[in-house]
């Protein structure tokens, strides 16, 4: 068995990493001779951890498959002295169950549940559509951030390389094997800024200004949208942009522009206490029951849930659910609720900052966050 250590200055990584990562966190990645934890062995365990103002990458490398027990023993001893939580990439599905099984076969006790942490792959899955990535392999995410690699192999292709190394002990083959694991460890650390995109799903941004714009689509039809300028609580590692029928967005650094479709229509606000109203059949409107006694009964009938509404013509923004702002509908069974923008717009189709109340801020933050969560790029 060989043990390799390489240190990096914390300044080589994003400055927030040491604050973002819980105390005594270890990043773990394993290399194996196959996918079966019953039949195959672990030949390398990579560990990355913070030590003072440095990041240290340690590799426990088995020169022979028979040395698996040694590297597992060293791994468990290290965890017992230095670890409270474990971070991995796809570790909950592969690395950690594999380690548990191999430890058990050698008579060691190891349970991943004793080291609560994060699986970066699972955490990043909800971001796939937002980042518009076809796959979420570690190398795909690294390429998205512009992270290069010297390593050209994947774990599966290195199995035959390890078998040849085991026979020859060729140092060049060992370098290839260790390089892949080492760059996986570095890659995990460098992918941590992707967590910053979660601020978009959590609505951690502030609306700075809003105005309605009118544009022509590819068919020449005029369409209205509400353009919202945002400031983000934290900067994003890479600019992103996207468009579909529900939202258009551009985020760069600590700023963002979001456009939401707006419709011009006559919509209805349905009154819940319909029993207190009467419907005028000629005027197609409602009056309170206290006034109905003065109207000819042949032109007046008790209101129903379907016709007890106040019509409003204007510009409307579709929302996710009914609220104090989103309360208009196309009809009573319509599950989409709309907010009337007309009274908020000035002569330049802008919504003044003074009119963006804390309650409206929160409502629109939730709406934008929900649209971003559900975003799927147009094909």
Positions of the model-derived regions?
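DEDD superfamily 3′-5′ metal-dependent exonuclease/proofreading module
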Residues: 1-28, 33-40, 50-379
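Short beta-strand scaffold segments in enzyme catalytic cores
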Residues: 45-47
């Amino acid at each position: 068995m060989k043990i390799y250590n390489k240190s990096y200055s914390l300044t080589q990584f994003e400055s927030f990493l040491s604050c973002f990562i819980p105390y005594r966190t270890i990043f773990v990645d394993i290399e194996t001779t196959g996918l079966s934890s019953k039949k195959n062995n672990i030949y390398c365990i990579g560990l990355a951890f913070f030590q003072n103002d440095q990041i240290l990458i340690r590799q426990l490398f088995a020169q022979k498959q028979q040395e698996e027990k040694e590297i597992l023993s060293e791994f468990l001893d290290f965890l017992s002295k230095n670890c409270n939580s474990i971070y991995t990439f796809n570790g909950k599905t592969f690395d950690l169950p594999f380690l548990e099984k191999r430890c058990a076969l050698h008579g060691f006790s190891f349970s991943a549940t004793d080291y609560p942490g994060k699986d970066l792959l699972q955490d990043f899955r909800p971001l796939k559509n937002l980042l518009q990535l076809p796959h979420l392999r570690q190398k795909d995410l690294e390429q998205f951030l512009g992270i290069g690699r010297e390593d050209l192999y994947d774990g599966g292709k290195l199995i035959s390389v390890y078998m040849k190394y085991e026979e020859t002990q060729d140092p060049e083959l060992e370098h290839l094997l260790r390089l892949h694991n080492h760059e996986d460890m570095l890659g995990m650390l460098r992918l941590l800024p992707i967590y910053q995109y979660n601020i978009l799903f959590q609505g951690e941004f502030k609306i700075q200004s809003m105005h309605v714009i009118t544009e022509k689509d590819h068919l020449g039809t005029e369409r209205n949208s509400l353009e919202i300028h945002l400031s983000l609580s934290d900067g994003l590692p890479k600019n992103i942009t996207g468009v579909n029928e529900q939202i258009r967005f551009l985020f760069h650094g600590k700023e963002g522009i979001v456009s939401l479709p707006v419709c011009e229509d006559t919509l209805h606000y349905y009154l819940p206490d319909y029993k207190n109203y009467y419907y005028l059949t000629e005027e197609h409107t409602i009056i309170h029951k206290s006034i109905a006694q003065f109207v000819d009964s042949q032109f007046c009938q008790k209101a129903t849930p379907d016709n007890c509404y106040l019509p409003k013509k204007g510009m409307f923004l579709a929302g996710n659910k009914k609220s104090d702002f989103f309360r208009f509908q196309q009809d009573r069974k319509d599950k989409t609720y709309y907010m009337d923008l007309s009274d908020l717009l000035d002569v330049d189709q802008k919504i003044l900052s003074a009119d963006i109340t804390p309650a409206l801020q929160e409502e629109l933050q939730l709406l934008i966050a929900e649209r971003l969560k559900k975003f799927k790029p147009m094909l």
